[in-house]
């Protein structure tokens, strides 16, 4: 249920979310869309999109990578948000941006990789994509800056969220909050695995539906 967490998402933080708003955030709006038939979607992973050594992007692999303008590769091609603009897309589909479990945010100097389909805290941006995973406000502010920059570029944002399972049912925040409620179980009391990921959330139960929707 947390909306702010510290490094690796182990503890929630209490903060005024308004303090994380970038300048002019109150004026941020989705770009207009005349017809659904006009939609052109570009799927991207935060880290992959900007990590290349010749991307010309300063904040490689971070939310802020998508706020940098005027970046080019070593051979002069547009990169980053300028590349997205020249493609003429209407939407970016961002692979999981929420806090996920498999990347250790205390060791970002070491090679680690995951698409992010191992949710830990659904309502918090992942710290590995922020410039300081130890500060709860930084990841939120930088995520908002990214969204704001994309909107200003005329690009809508779609978030990829997987609610059908979590990283670890036994140690999940759901299970710690209400044991046995948020996950389906087999007749012998084991975690059901309809997702193929080791567990499956019980979307048929009222509070899980409310959480998702």
Where are these regions (language model features)?
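The feature marks proteins involved in alpha-glucan
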Residues: 1-43, 48-68
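Substrate-binding/active-site clefts of carbohydrate-active enzymes
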Residues: 47-213
């Amino acid at each position: 249920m947390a909306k702010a967490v510290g490094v690796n998402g182990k503890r929630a933080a209490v903060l005024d979310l308004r303090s994380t708003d970038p300048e002019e955030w109150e004026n941020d709006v989705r770009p207009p869309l005349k017809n659904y038939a006009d939609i052109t979607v570009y799927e991207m992973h935060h880290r992959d999109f900007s990590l290349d050594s010749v991307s010309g992007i300063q904040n490689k692999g971070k939310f802020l990578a998508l706020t940098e303008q005027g970046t080019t590769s070593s051979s002069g091609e547009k990169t980053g948000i300028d590349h997205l603009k020249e493609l003429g897309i209407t939407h970016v589909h961002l692979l999981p941006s929420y806090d996920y479990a498999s990347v250790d945010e205390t060791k970002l100097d070491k090679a680690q990789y995951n698409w992010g389909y191992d949710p830990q805290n659904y309502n918090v941006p992942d710290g590995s994509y922020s410039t300081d995973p130890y500060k709860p406000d930084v990841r939120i502010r930088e995520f908002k800056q990214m969204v704001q920059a994309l909107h200003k570029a005329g690009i809508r944002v779609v978030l990829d969220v997987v609610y059908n399972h979590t990283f670890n049912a036994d140690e999940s925040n759901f299970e710690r909050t209400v044991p046995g409620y948020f996950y389906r179980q087999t007749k012998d009391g084991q975690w059901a695995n309809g997702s193929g990921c080791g567990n499956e959330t019980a979307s048929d139960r009222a509070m899980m539906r409310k959480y998702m929707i």
